[in-house]
Amino acid sequence: MTMDKSELVQKAKLAEQAERYDDMAAAMKAVTEQGHELSNEERNLLSVAYKNVVGARRSSWRVISSIEQKTERNEKKQQMGKEYREKIEAELQDICSDVLELLDKYLILNATHAESKVFYLKMKGDYFRYLSEVASGDNKQTTVSNSQQAYQEAFEISKKEMQPTHPIRLGLALNFSVFYYEILNSPEKACSLAKTAFDEAIAELDTLNEESYKDSTLIMQLLRDNLTLWTSENQGDEGDAGEGEN
C-alpha cells in the first residue's frame, strides 16, 4: 500500500517524536520523491531527519578515529578500529549520497523562492562537507570543491534576496564559516565571514519578526561563540569546545 503525502508527513512526525530518525528520513525521502515542491514544514522535517541520521554517524566516526589513533601500538586493536571506522564511513557516504541525489533531482530544481533555493544549496554544501570530512586524495578535493561551490552560490543569492537577520541567511553564514575554518584551514576568512554576518544582523535587529526572533538570535550567539573560540585558538590558547553548526 502506498501512502499519500499527508500520511507520510504524519509518519515522519511520529518518528521524530519517537526519535527514530532513520524512519523519519525514509518517510520524508518518499515525500520528496513525489516531485512536488516541499512546504516550509516538510522542508524542515526532511532537514531535521537527515541531520540526525548523518549526525549520529559523524559523531561515531570521530570517536572511532580517536580510539584508532590511541591504539597505534596494538596492531590487532588498530585493525579492528580501522574496519569499524570504514563501516561507519560507508554508512555516512550512503546517507550523504541519498541527500545529494534528492537535492539535485528534486529539491533545488523545484525551488521557486529564493529562501528555499538558499536552504537547499546550503544543505548541498553541508552534505558535501560531511563527505569531505571522511574523504582522502582526489575524492577529498572533489567534495571540498563541490561544497564550496554550493555554499558560494547560496551565499550570493542570500545577500541579494534576504535580510541579514533571516535565520536561513545566518545559518548559511555560520556553516560556510565552519567550512572555511575546519575544511579549508582558513581562520582569517572564517572569522571575517562570521563577523560580517553577525555585525550586519546586529545593525538590523529591528527588522526581526516575531516568529524568527528566537532562531535568528540563537544562530547569532553561535556565530559569536565560534568567533571567540577561533580567535583564542589563533592566539595560541587551546580551545576545547567544538564549533557550533546549524
UniProtKB/Swiss-Prot annotation:
The modification N-acetylthreonine is found at residue 2. The alpha, brain-specific form differs from the beta form in being phosphorylated. Phosphorylated on Ser-60 by protein kinase C delta type catalytic subunit in a sphingosine-dependent fashion. Isoform Short contains a N-acetylmethionine at position 1. The keyword Phosphoprotein applies. Its main location: cytoplasm. One of its GO terms (cellular component) is cytoplasm. The modification Phosphoserine is found at residues 60, 186, 232. Keywords: Acetylation, Cytoplasm, Isopeptide bond, Nitration, Phosphoprotein, Ubl conjugation. The keyword Signal does not apply. It comes from the Eukaryota. Homodimer. Interacts with SAMSN1 and PRKCE. Interacts with AKAP13. Interacts with SSH1 and TORC2/CRTC2. Interacts with ABL1; the interaction results in cytoplasmic location of ABL1 and inhibition of cABL-mediated apoptosis. Interacts with ROR2 (dimer); the interaction results in phosphorylation of YWHAB on tyrosine residues. Interacts with GAB2. Interacts with YAP1 (phosphorylated form). Interacts with the phosphorylated (by AKT1) form of SRPK2. Interacts with PKA-phosphorylated AANAT. Interacts with MYO1C. Interacts with SIRT2. Interacts with the 'Thr-369' phosphorylated form of DAPK2. This is 14-3-3 protein beta/alpha. It comes from Rattus norvegicus.
